[in-house]
A protein has these predicted regions:
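Conserved metal-binding segment of the jelly-roll/cupin
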Residues: 132-148
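A short hydrophobic beta-strand segment most commonly corresponding to one strand
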Residues: 109-114, 139-141, 155-172
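Non-heme Fe(II)/2-oxoglutarate
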Residues: 1-79
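C-terminal interaction module
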Residues: 175-201
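Asparagine-centered strand-capping/turn motif at beta-strand->loop junctions
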Residues: 149-154
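A short beta-strand-loop-beta hairpin characteristic of the jelly-roll/cupin
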Residues: 115-135
Length: 201
């Protein structure tokens, strides 16, 4: 089962950071998510995903862009990755945190890493025993229908732009969690690899 694919677009990461930080600083959000697209009501809060792909929202109908993003570099980058995006959001994961291991009801997501420090923050697929980091300037397709988590081992927030293919339909497969010991095991192994690389570097 394919878990991810990397695309090298050579995005202007400094310009992306500037636009993303402007949105975050001007629109505080306790949920650490900012909706760049909306379904019915404009704004950065109305279409955030608090259920993390659980099917609580029809994500493929979230296709309208907030008007101030009309000529933005963010929007330009998203359309370079995919011609039919939906549910585009900025997501922030605080330092030292990770998402619960889960399965999304939508089969895949596209990711544009904005603030990231590989290999210290990374996707983890415990069931498949796979870890991978995302690099600035690139974009990624991620199979979120597989058990996955995201781990931020950096002493700063991790910030990504994330969106769907609007043609992707919700799958009724129930969300499930995986025993945390499986996640801890591969995180420990990943830390050992990082330490070895730094030691020999």
């Amino acid at each position: 089962m394919k878990l991810y694919k990397e695309y090298n677009f050579n995005f202007d990461i400094d310009l992306l950071k500037k636009e993303v930080l402007k949105i975050i600083s001007n629109t505080k959000n306790v949920h650490k998510q900012w909706a760049l697209q909306y379904s019915k009501i404009p704004g950065y809060y109305n279409d955030v995903d608090l259920g993390y792909g659980s099917g609580s929202r029809e994500e493929n109908k979230i296709t309208n862009w907030n008007e101030e993003l009309e000529n933005s570099y963010i929007k330009e980058c998203v359309y370079k990755v995919h011609p039919n995006p939906s549910n585009t959001r900025i997501m922030l994961l605080n330092l030292g945190q990770c998402y619960p291991t889960h399965v999304d009801g939508y089969r895949s997501r596209y990711q544009i890493p904005v603030f990231t420090v590989p290999p210290l923050d990374y996707f983890a697929f415990p069931k498949d025993k796979v870890i991978f980091s995302m690099y600035p300037g690139k974009a990624y397709w991620v199979n979120t229908h597989a058990y996955h988590s995201y781990v931020n081992g950096v002493e700063a927030p991790r910030i990504n732009i994330i969106f769907n293919d609007a043609a992707d339909e919700f799958d009724e497969t129930p969300q499930q969690t995986l025993e945390h010991k499986n996640l801890r095991k591969i995180i420990k192994k990943h830390k050992e690899i990082i330490n070895e690389v730094h030691h020999h570097g």
